[in-house]
A protein has these predicted regions:
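Long, low-complexity intrinsically disordered regions
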Residues: 1-272, 287-306
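C-terminal accessory/binding modules appended to enzymatic or scaffolding proteins
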Residues: 277-280, 306
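PLD/PLD-like phosphodiesterase catalytic module centered on the HKD motif
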Residues: 283
């Protein structure tokens, strides 16, 4: 089993995530390879794509949005990401039925979450795009509380009913899944696919973010050990295992490259995928510097890598 230095781990993570020589051919390819681009702030998600796709323009991105080649839904860690539409099912498969705070929150307000979701879907089916204000009117007096931090939109997204229309600086409109695909919900859910959502997530993670530890995957996915460990242990047999300077096992789907050159400095935007994907924060920055990157209230600053 080959050992890796901290520098080799860092350089190969930069390489595999599309920041060095191995860049992606399109925004859709980058979004798919990384299994989503965190985008609660749309402009920072776009910077993550500009850094990984040569010659990408704002016009290219807008075409991808207009053609619905890229959509926004809630995914890992219950945060908004840009995904390709084909990956929506995998997000649903992993997260839709996980216990989360949404149902309890609705109950605490005296509202039935399932009933709310039915009403929201009825509104979505009547219009191509529905504004946040229209949903607020539908939800009534409790609208603000039901929509806080994404609220009921999160479950609607995880259920495969609604997606956010990508727009800067933040989401204003939502659309139904039938704007992308006319497939009925029951067929969309039951159609056979070559991999489960969890298998797909694990494979993409160790391809784009390896070398990484099991704890890193847990951090990135936001899942509990019992949600993933059995499947992960089976898939790890197909990956390459390395030993880091800290004595931990690091896994990668691809063989690591030696003598990776960074070349020119890299300016990564806030919430770049590299900075939300690892449990150990000092893999690239010193302990002193990490507090300047990871701020309070979950904020992650832009970073210049020299």
């Amino acid at each position: 089993m080959r050992s890796l230095t901290n520098a080799e781990i860092a350089h190969n993570r930069l390489l595999n995530s599309g920041l060095l020589q191995s860049k992606f051919s399109s925004a859709e390819d980058a979004t798919r390879a990384l299994f989503g681009i965190q985008s609660q702030y749309q402009q920072f998600g776009e910077i993550s794509l500009f850094n990984r796709v040569p010659n990408l323009t704002k016009e290219n991105l807008q075409m991808a949005y207009d053609d619905k080649g890229i959509i926004k839904i809630w995914g890992q860690r219950m945060t908004v990401h840009m995904y390709t539409p084909d990956d929506w099912f995998y997000v649903h498969d992993v997260y839709a039925n996980k216990n989360n705070w949404l149902r309890k929150h609705a109950d605490s307000l005296g509202r039935d979450l399932d009933e709310i979701l039915v009403q929201m879907e009825e509104l979505l089916l009547r219009e191509d795009k529905v504004s946040k204000e229209s949903f607020a009117a539908l939800l009534g007096n409790e609208a603000k509380e039901l929509m806080t931090w994404g609220g009921v939109f999160i479950q609607g997204s995880l259920d495969g009913k609604l997606f956010c229309v990508p727009e800067s600086p933040k989401t204003k409109f939502y659309s139904h899944r039938n704007q992308i695909d006319s497939e009925r919900e029951d067929a969309w859910i039951t159609n056979k696919r070559s991999k489960t959502g969890l298998e797909t997530m694990i494979d993409r993670y160790f391809s784009a973010f390896g070398p990484a530890t099991i704890q890193d995957f847990k951090h990135w996915s936001g899942l509990r050990n019992s949600d993933y460990i059995e499947t992960l242990e089976k898939l790890l047999e197909n990956y390459i295992c390395y030993i880091g300077e800290d004595g931990k096992n690091y896994y990668s789907k691809a063989k690591t490259q030696e003598n990776v050159e960074m070349g020119s400095p890299l300016l990564l935007g806030k919430f770049d995928p590299l900075f939300v994907s690892y449990a150990k924060k000092n893999w690239l920055a010193s302990e002193k510097e990490t507090s300047l990157i990871w701020r309070t209230a979950g904020q992650i600053e832009a970073v210049l890598i020299i």
